[in-house]
């Protein structure tokens, strides 16, 4: 123990680290058999702060290469090779730009926000979620359809940054390097190509409100939400280094692109072209910024999304792969459900192809696969818990394309159609 008996019989206490007495410091904190003074506490805090800052810089220096990012995306997202390449390069350059800004330099690198365009169910949201997981940065998703201008009923755009803060546990420094994914951005287009003379608070008004946020501004964010707690202190968040990814299905944009490609010639010498029978995703590859303006995005908004990544329709092979290959594939999920009933669930190759074809016909992409499987297996899942000796359920092409029930294999190996309650 750091004590010393003086001549007058009183014990003087000393700091166990620097050796100063209790009379030389403002505060001496006692621990089990040791003491530490306020000066040593401050010194320790400075050391920890510096080491934390240094380790943080090292972590941000190690940005994965575009090939590494693309390889991880391949593990989670089926197909979309071109979109993955565009995203991998854009994200790598974004975080390289942040490291460049930390080190200082004469040339300031501009931010490149990303616009993902593709049919519904093709993997736009999953790509953004996977990117955030790879980079280990705060990530939040916002639905553009719920946003309105400040002062109107609905969500303010600042709430997007509040969600990002919440995902970073209110660590402002970390949130300022995060990723924001704004879904359904095609639903906030203005109603006509010409500027509106009336207020459009959920369309063009939201685009205007998002401009500064996406370009870079210091946003005043209410930690508890702005409208219910008007007296609270605001947090200041700089959005300059936040990467914004916007996504949408843009239904009808393919017709605008196709019309631009056709032209409108008339007469005997006109170049008459047939109907464009390409898929929506293929047509999107010919996208130009002017097409987005015709669709209803304002020029300033398009200008703040310089990186365009178009996603293709998922073909039959891709949908079959989605059904069977990923770690949490739908087929594996239903097989696990049947295992809980001590029954094996199998799908024939023809059945998987038929399920994929039906999803393509519905134009729902990968998102519609679960509802198709539910339709096929509903009666079987209803009857199975009350049946005994069923060891296997086989889904064949007939069960997918007609009202026939999947086959049930009993312990005696005889096959019979499943009875629909």
Swiss-Prot record:
Record bears the keyword Metal-binding: yes
Alphabetical keyword list: ATP-binding, Chaperone, Metal-binding, Nucleotide-binding, Zinc
GO CC annotation: HslUV protease complex
Entry-linked InterPro entries: AAA+_ATPase, ATP-dep_Clp_protease_ClpX, ATPase_AAA_core, Clp_ATPase_C, Clp_protease_ATP-bd_su_ClpX, ClpX_bact, P-loop_NTPase, Znf_CppX_C4
Residues reported in the UniProt entry to bind ATP: 119-126
GO MF terms held by the record: ATP binding; ATP hydrolysis activity; ATP-dependent protein folding chaperone; protein dimerization activity; unfolded protein binding; zinc ion binding
Residue ranges of domain ClpX-type ZB in the record: 3-56
Any one of the GO BP annotations: proteolysis involved in protein catabolic process
Positions annotated to bind Zn(2+): 15, 18, 37, 40
PROSITE patterns named in the record: CLPX_ZB
Domain of life (superkingdom): Bacteria
Chain's role: ATP-dependent specificity component of the Clp protease. It directs the protease to specific substrates. Can perform chaperone functions in the absence of ClpP.
Similarity comment: family membership: Belongs to the ClpX chaperone family.
Self-association state and partner proteins as the record states: Component of the ClpX-ClpP complex. Forms a hexameric ring that, in the presence of ATP, binds to fourteen ClpP subunits assembled into a disk-like structure with a central cavity, resembling the structure of eukaryotic proteasomes.
Annotated protein name in UniProt: ATP-dependent Clp protease ATP-binding subunit ClpX
Originating organism: Roseobacter denitrificans (strain ATCC 33942 / OCh 114) (Erythrobacter sp. (strain OCh 114))
Phylogenetic placement of the source organism: Bacteria, Pseudomonadati, Pseudomonadota, Alphaproteobacteria, Rhodobacterales
The encoding gene: clpX
């Amino acid at each position: 123990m750091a004590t010393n008996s003086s001549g007058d019989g009183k014990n003087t206490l000393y700091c166990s680290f620097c050796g100063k007495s209790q009379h030389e410091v403002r505060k001496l904190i006692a621990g089990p058999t040791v003491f530490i003074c306020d000066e040593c506490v401050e010194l320790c805090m400075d050391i920890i702060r510096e080491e934390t800052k240094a380790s943080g810089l090292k972590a941000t220096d190690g940005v994965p290469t575009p090939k590494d990012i693309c390889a991880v995306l391949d593990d989670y997202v089926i197909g979309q090779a071109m979109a993955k390449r565009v995203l991998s390069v854009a994200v790598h350059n974004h975080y390289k730009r942040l490291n460049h800004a930390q080190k200082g330099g004469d040339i300031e690198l501009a931010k490149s926000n990303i616009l993902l365009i593709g049919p519904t169910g093709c993997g736009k949201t999953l790509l953004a979620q996977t990117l955030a997981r790879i980079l280990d940065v705060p990530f939040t998703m916002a639905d553009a359809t719920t946003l309105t201008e400040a002062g109107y009923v609905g969500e303010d755009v600042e709430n997007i940054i509040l969600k990002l803060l919440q995902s970073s546990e209110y660590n402002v420094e970390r949130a300022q390097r995060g990723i924001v994914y704004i879904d359904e951005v095609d639903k906030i287009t203005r109603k006509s190509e010409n500027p509106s003379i009336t207020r459009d608070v959920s369309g063009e008004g939201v685009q205007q409100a998002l401009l500064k946020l996406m370009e870079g501004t210091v946003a005043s964010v209410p930690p508890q939400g702005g409208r219910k707690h008007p007296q609270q202190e605001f947090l200041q968040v700089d959005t300059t280094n936040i990467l914004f990814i916007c996504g949408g299905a843009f239904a009808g944009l393919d017709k605008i692109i196709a019309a631009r490609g056709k032209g409108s010639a008339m007469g005997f010498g006109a170049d008459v072209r047939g109907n464009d029978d390409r898929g929506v995703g293929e047509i999107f590859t010919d996208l130009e910024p002017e097409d987005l303006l015709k669709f209803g995005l304002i020029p300033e908004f398009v200008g703040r999304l310089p990186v365009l990544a178009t996603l293709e329709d998922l073909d039959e092979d891709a949908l079959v792969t989605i059904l069977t290959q990923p770690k949490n594939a739908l087929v594996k999920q239903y097989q696990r459900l049947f295992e809980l009933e001590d029954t094996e669930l199998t799908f024939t190759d023809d059945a998987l192809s038929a399920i994929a074809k039906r999803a393509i016909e519905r134009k729902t992409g990968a998102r519609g696969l679960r509802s198709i499987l539910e339709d096929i297996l509903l009666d079987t899942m209803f009857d199975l818990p009350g049946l005994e000796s069923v060891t296997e359920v086989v889904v064949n092409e007939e069960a997918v394309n007609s009202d026939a029930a999947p086959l049930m294999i009993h312990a005696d190996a005889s096959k019979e159609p499943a009875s629909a309650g």
